[in-house]
Amino acid sequence: PFASIVAWVPFNEAWGQHDTNETLTYVMRFDPTRLVDGPSGWTDMGLGHMRDHHLYQGAEQLPEPESGRATVYGEFGGISLYIDGHSMFEKGWGYTKTESVEDFLTSYEELLTAIGGLIPEGLAGAIYTQTTDVESEINGLLTYDRKYKLQPEKVRLIHEKIL
């Protein structure tokens, strides 16, 4: 029931990325009790506790692992569903468009099943993008005004099958 910080992520997708290895070294020395993701997504410089990939289409094959670093998907998913009256704008954006709750649930289950199949191959973690819809992105499990898109019980059953 308590939030916690388990990893530091100084850079995401090269946004403001500079002096990468110096920054990662500083963070690892400053807080040796937590993992350091360096960086999440695009421009990896070979430092940090994990090699973080972003995946939005398919999950058939795990990227080549690196010795001494965990392989994770720091972002995956991107399944979009517009729910009338629960978005900031009439149109939103996502990688995979669905037209109904049923389509969203099917796409979500297929993607998580594929991700789960990569665990025995060495996938150490994956973070669904994203928990909630935001202004222009409708990829969330919850709408912009924090209503469920999918019944929590159905999501739990999918997760239990994989884990």
Located regions from the model:
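Surface beta-strand/loop "capping" patches
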Residues: K161-L163
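Substrate-binding/catalytic cleft of secreted carbohydrate-active enzymes
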Residues: P1-H159
